[in-house]
Amino acid sequence: MIEINDNRLKTAKQFGVDHTINSLNEDPIDAVRKLTNGKGADKVISANPSTQAQAQAIFMAKRTGIVVFFGGVAKGALTELDTNYIHYNGLWIYGHYGSNSMQVQKSFELAISDEFESEKFITHILPLSEINKGISLTKSGKAIKVVLHPNDQ
């Protein structure tokens, strides 16, 4: 997992992520290439609103690999991609938005299963009256998920 927030990387480890890379501290392309003995990853999912991350993602994939742009960037923001690299390395590029009914069902089943420890995502529990604090914590990256209780003070 590649992230710029150390708290999120630490949380990812709790869910069994094998490798974490803070892209503020090291070049993510070099790090992925090193982890894969120079080959690149089979699949790369860019799930963030960064055009830079999208541009970097293609260089993390192996020849004939798959790159998925899951997180949308700001409206009007354009990502510059090296289409020569994409073409000559036979990369498959997909954009993904939303989900179908089967994906929703599988997600629901996972979320309620004993295998998925959803409470690990919850970093803050606040009363509804502190909604602005919850938003600030999330925007600043200090919170993973905030739960708001409507009847608490």
Question: What residue ranges belong to the model's regions?
Answer:
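Residues in the short beta-alpha loop(s) of Rossmann-like NAD(P)-binding domains
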Residues: 5, 73, 99
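Rossmann-fold NAD(P)-binding glycine/threonine-rich loop
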Residues: 72-90, 104-109
